[in-house]
Amino acid sequence: MSENLIIFNARIVTPTGTSARKGAEMGQLRIIENGTVEVTKGIITYVGESRGEDRDGYYQHYWHYNARGHCLLPGFVDSHTHFVFGGERSEEFSWRLKGESYMSIMERGGGIASTVKATRQMNFLKLRSAAEGFLKKMSAMGVTTVEGKSGYGLDRETELLQLKIMRSLNNDEHKRIDIVSTFLGAHALPEEYKGRGDEYIDFLIREMLPVIRENELAECCDVFCEQGVFSVEQSRRLLQAAKEQGFLLKLHADEIVSFGGAELAAELGALSADHLLQASDAGIRAMADAGVVATLLPLTAFALKEPYARGREMIDAGCAVALATDLNPGSCFSGSIPLTIALACIYMKLSIEETITALTLNGAAALHRADRIGSIEVGKQGDFVILNSDNYHILPYYVGMNCVIMTIKGGMLYPVN
């Protein structure tokens, strides 16, 4: 199959632009009836109404696909996941059902520490195979770009191993998903540094960041800025050092309590602040003013039985909101794009149009990719999804059920069985 592709007879539905859409802009989509998209060598070269399938034989080396009037959307961007890990934590789910909190499970040695132990015991091939399995499931739900975090090693060897696995998968010539790697060494305090959080931050700054940067293993640096994990000052120190070394910045912020994480993201000019269940009004305003993408993770709130982030208020305050799954082995063992969409509409009060923007262009902006993915426009990558309907309103209507029938990556067609 060729990377040269013509999709015709499509109902094209897309946000537009090369930066995040904020506030009311998020609800503005371009819709083209009976549309055609041309992709040449993986890049979009035409978007518009049909102009005939052959111009002097120009299209003879193109694969033709009749969308039969179905909706054609940009490929989904899952901009916050933890898909490289060992083990599983199903027992913790039953603990939460009995009333234990996320933090209380961490305090008793479960949570992230449990996955760290399992991940440290696995080798490259086993971890890579498991991660590849998750990527295949993501592709079937229309994801064409994903962010993946380290953070289940919390030591030099295993953190680098996670990042090398993501690089290996991203360099696979048969890949269906582009991977943006994030270093999350500050995911939790490892047992060997218990009570010595400042020393662990020193270790990350002096021994991890330079090696990762030199070997181009990650573009972004993230930190779990939360009460009982890493303080605002510790987070600031790590992220400032990362920024000086050329990393883009992301934060796990204000998930458990209002802790000043959103404000810190704005202060440092982070790409995104993620979770934000407890973000303050001041933090929301600061993110809007600074252009920080608010990445919301409704599946995690659902699984933890926590209040949802205030998506509607954030958009109304002028924020750029993205949506992601937060696939991980503990608080959210799900990569369900369909359920993410439904929860965002039902509980975060986003419109269907806003969820599309949040999962495409704004997700791309949260990964510093809005200039090349996230919308169906000339010059961007030929990454799309085709739905099983001409009505994109089915996205939340299909609660937890997949309505994607075709994922297209760089002009390559991948039917969904």
Curated annotation (Swiss-Prot):
UniProt keywords, alphabetically: Cytoplasm, Histidine metabolism, Hydrolase, Iron, Metal-binding, Zinc
Enzyme Commission number(s): 3.5.2.7
Cofactor, free-text remark: Binds 1 zinc or iron ion per subunit.
Pathway(s) the chain acts in: Amino-acid degradation; L-histidine degradation into L-glutamate; N-formimidoyl-L-glutamate from L-histidine: step 3/3
Sample GO molecular function, one term: iron ion binding
UniProt-listed Pfam families: Amidohydro_3 (PF07969)
Gene Ontology annotations for the cellular component aspect, listed alphabetically: cytoplasm
Binding sites annotated in the UniProt record for Fe(3+): H80, H82, H252, D326
Binding of 4-imidazolone-5-propanoate, residues: R89, Y152, H187, E255, S331
CDD domains membership: Imidazolone-5PH
Binding site for N-formimidoyl-L-glutamate: Y152, N328, G330
Gene3D superfamilies (UniProt xref): Metal-dependent hydrolases (3.20.20.140), Urease, subunit C, domain 1 (2.30.40.10)
Entry binding sites for Zn(2+): H80, H82, H252, D326
GO biological process, one term: L-histidine catabolic process
Location in the cell: Cytoplasm
Domain of life: Bacteria
Co-factor(s): Zn(2+); Fe(3+)
Main location: cytoplasm
Reactions catalysed according to its record: 4-imidazolone-5-propanoate + H2O = N-formimidoyl-L-glutamate
PANTHER family assigned to the protein according to its UniProt record, in alphabetical order: IMIDAZOLONEPROPIONASE, IMIDAZOLONEPROPIONASE-RELATED
Similarity section: Belongs to the metallo-dependent hydrolases superfamily. HutI family.
Protein's job: Catalyzes the hydrolytic cleavage of the carbon-nitrogen bond in imidazolone-5-propanoate to yield N-formimidoyl-L-glutamate. It is the third step in the universal histidine degradation pathway.
Designated name of the protein: Imidazolonepropionase
Organism for this UniProt entry: Bacteroides thetaiotaomicron (strain ATCC 29148 / DSM 2079 / JCM 5827 / CCUG 10774 / NCTC 10582 / VPI-5482 / E50)
Chain's gene name: hutI
